[in-house]
């Protein structure tokens, strides 16, 4: 089984915010592959299904971003899986809005959700799909920025990125992550 985790904050008020790019990607996968993400387990909304024949578990932690690792660790423990069985999709301030970057491992890079995952999984070695949200203009607080919605001018870019993230996850069900990474990291915007 492959586990696809999207990071975000629960609740209507955070629904279309920059920090919820991971949740947006899970919603896209859910819609595209007909996998409802409605079960409340592991302090998360989860959905089990198949993508191209491979069993997958879609996960949207409901712990708020900074505690995401607690929920993810519960999922892995219950299913007796290891970090190599998962990919996490999340927002990245250091990428232009709408760009993707896939990595096999790495540091938290200042992202509190990833910091929590590293802490609770005990490793930095898990796959990532970063969705670019750009940095705020000088003088604007980062926390205010990530908790606001995308302006109209950026919505098409973010929807395209979320769609590509969903495609990357589907490809991962049948190919090595290295191959997926090489393909999607080479796409030009």
UniProtKB/Swiss-Prot annotation:
Location(s), subcellular: Cytoplasm
Active site residues of this protein: 19 (proton acceptor)
A cellular component annotation (GO) from this entry: cytoplasm
UniProt signal peptide: none
A Pfam entry, by short name: Pept_tRNA_hydro
Keyword tRNA-binding: yes
Protein name as annotated: Peptidyl-tRNA hydrolase
């Amino acid at each position: 089984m492959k586990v696809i985790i999207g990071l975000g904050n629960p609740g209507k008020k955070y629904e279309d915010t920059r920090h919820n790019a991971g949740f947006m990607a899970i919603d896209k996968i859910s819609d595209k592959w007909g996998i409802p993400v409605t079960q409340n387990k592991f302090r998360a909304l989860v959905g089990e299904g198949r993508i191209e024949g491979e069993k997958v578990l879609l996960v949207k932690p409901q712990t708020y971003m900074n505690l995401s690792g607690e929920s993810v660790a519960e999922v892995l423990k219950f299913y007796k899986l290891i970090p190599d069985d998962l990919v996490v999709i999340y927002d990245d301030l250091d990428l232009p809005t709408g760009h993707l970057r896939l990595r096999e491992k790495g540091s938290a890079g200042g992202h509190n959700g990833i910091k929590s995952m590293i802490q609770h999984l005990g490793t930095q070695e898990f796959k990532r799909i970063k969705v670019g949200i750009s940095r705020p203009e000088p003088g604007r607080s980062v926390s205010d920025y990530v908790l606001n919605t995308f302006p109209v001018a950026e919505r098409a870019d973010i929807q395209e990125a979320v769609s590509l993230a969903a495609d990357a996850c589907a490809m991962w069900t049948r190919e090595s992550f290295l191959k997926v990474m090489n393909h999607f990291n080479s796409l030009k915007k």
